[in-house]
């Protein structure tokens, strides 16, 4: 995805984003300190909606399975225009969110798709995480690429009103196998947009987005997404 399209995506996502423990007894060891978060807000895949201004007319995502065990299947076929999905994070979670967890599996990798190489910016699966501070949007795009070094950060695009980094979360690997991901939201934001300052201010988490594409490589691309939750 080129820089111009990435900026358009930011604008599109912006539209979407407008019990106690018993006391230990004398014979029992003390309880461990509580975790920094104790709640888990599940996000059904059916909650994701098309980001109209960044999407073509043909929908290629489909919710599969019963409501209590569903996943989102995505299959891009050229020459379709790409379609991006997004959702608003509930107001109550925007400052309280600590971690994001999800599962995904690549089914068809888009050839040599590599978000870090110009002209080959396609991925079997992408998860966008969006924060907003004042008038500025901050985005980290986690991708499952067909090629490239796992863990690499690239396509850093920072301006007055928008900033986006791409992180190659997975690259290549076996297709058809579910992988669970968990990211520390505040640590990720500080690493990318606060120079690693552990006390850097973190703005509201306002949105999430999904994308499976193969338009630059002109290659079929497919993946499944499931198990989204925000821990707080």
Model-identified regions with their sequence ranges:
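Extracellular carbohydrate-recognition regions
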Residues: 24-54
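Solvent-exposed strand-to-loop "edge" motifs in beta-rich extracellular domains
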Residues: 103-109, 132, 186
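Extracellular beta-strand ligand-recognition surfaces/modules
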Residues: 119-127, 171, 175-220
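Extracellular beta-strand elements of beta-rich domains used
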Residues: 208, 223-230
């Amino acid at each position: 995805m080129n820089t111009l399209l990435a900026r358009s995506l930011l604008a599109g996502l912006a539209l979407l984003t407008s019990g106690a423990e018993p006391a230990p007894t004398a014979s029992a060891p003390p309880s461990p300190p509580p975790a920094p978060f104790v709640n888990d807000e599940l996000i059904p895949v059916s909650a994701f909606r098309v980001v109209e201004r960044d999407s073509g007319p043909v929908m290629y995502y489909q919710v599969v399975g019963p409501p209590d065990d569903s996943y989102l299947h995505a299959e891009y076929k050229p020459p379709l225009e790409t379609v991006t999905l997004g959702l608003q994070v509930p107001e109550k979670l925007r400052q309280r969110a600590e971690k994001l967890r999800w599962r995904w599996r690549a089914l068809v990798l888009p050839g040599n798709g590599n978000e870090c190489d110009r002209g080959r910016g396609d991925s079997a699966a992408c998860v966008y995480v969006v924060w907003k501070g004042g008038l500025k949007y901050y985005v980290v795009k986690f991708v499952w690429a067909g090629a490239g070094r796992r863990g690499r950060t690239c396509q850093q695009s920072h301006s007055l009103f928008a900033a986006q980094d791409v992180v190659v979360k997975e690259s290549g690997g076996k297709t058809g196998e579910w992988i669970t991901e968990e990211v520390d939201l505040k640590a990720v934001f500080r690493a990318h947009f606060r120079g690693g300052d552990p006390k850097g201010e973190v703005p509201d988490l306002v949105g999430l987005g999904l994308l499976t594409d193969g338009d630059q490589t002109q290659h079929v691309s497919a993946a499944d997404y499931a198990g989204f939750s925000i821990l707080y």
